[in-house]
Amino acid sequence: MGRGRVELKMIENKINRQVTFAKRRKRLLKKAYELSVLCDAEVALIIFSNRGKLYEFCSSTSMLKTLEKYQKCNFGSPESTIISRETQSSQQEYLKLKNRVEALQRSQRNLLGEDLGPLGSKELEQLERQLDSSLRQIRSTRTQFMLDQLADLQRREQMLCEANKTLKRRFEESSQANQQQVWDPSNTHAVGYGRQPAQHHGEAFYHPLECEPTLQIGYHSDITMATATASTVNNYMPPGWLGQISGSYE
């Protein structure tokens, strides 16, 4: 009689389980080797026991090359996998941005009063509240801008007033210093306005004509006027001028 069919379930007895694992592992490795030799196939077999011990068989020279070949056939190359993931992510991002742009364009048209037909009552009320909020924000921004400009102008005005006061104070101090310098009697270089120093050497320029009283009757009137003029401007005519005038009339 042949063997009965073995029920496929885990063997409860640990010893029997280990014996069965060793027998079947050897037969499996033998079958893998026979398959690779008889059919000229590239066979790779990896077995881990329940304790984590590794058993392997590879018909090629390197197990890693066989595994890379397996990965390329099933999952493609790592680079192509990364590129495909990036492409898929970029496509999803593009679709999100496209939907966002369409929503913004539709909202912009609604704010401009266009394409309001498909909107319902609630959507129109929401649009109205949005417009009111935008107007309040715009007015608040404009008011703040005007207040900032006003404050800036006030600061400039204050700076100009301070500069004007400083210049005025300097001008007054300079004027007072000049007046004190002009009217100070101890300053020998100062000269008063509208005053000339007295000339005590007028006699050096004035030489009266020496003539007989009886001879003055026959003099011309021009000589008399020249003499009177010389007496009036006694401090400004040099001595030689009178002699030239009298000689011209003689």
UniProtKB/Swiss-Prot annotation:
* Domain MADS-box: from-to ranges: 3-57
According to its UniProt record, where is this protein mainly located?
nucleus
Q: Where in the numbering of this chain does the K-box domain appear?
A: 87-177
**What keywords are annotated for this sequence in UniProt?**
DNA-binding, Nucleus, Transcription, Transcription regulation
Please list the tissues where expression of this protein has been recorded: Expressed in petals and weakly in sepals but not in the column (gynostemium).
Q: Where in the cell is it found?
A: Nucleus
Its Gene Ontology molecular function terms?
A: DNA-binding transcription factor activity; protein dimerization activity; RNA polymerase II transcription regulatory region sequence-specific DNA binding
For this entry, list what GO says about its biological process: positive regulation of transcription by RNA polymerase II
Taxonomically, the superkingdom here is Eukaryota
The name on file for this protein is Agamous-like MADS-box protein AGL9 homolog
Q: What is the purpose of this protein?
A: Probable transcription factor active in inflorescence development and floral organogenesis.
Q: Which organism is it from?
A: Aranda deborah
- Spell out the InterPro entries in the cross-references: MADS-box/MEF2_TF, MEF2-like_N, TF_Kbox, TF_MADSbox, TF_MADSbox_sf
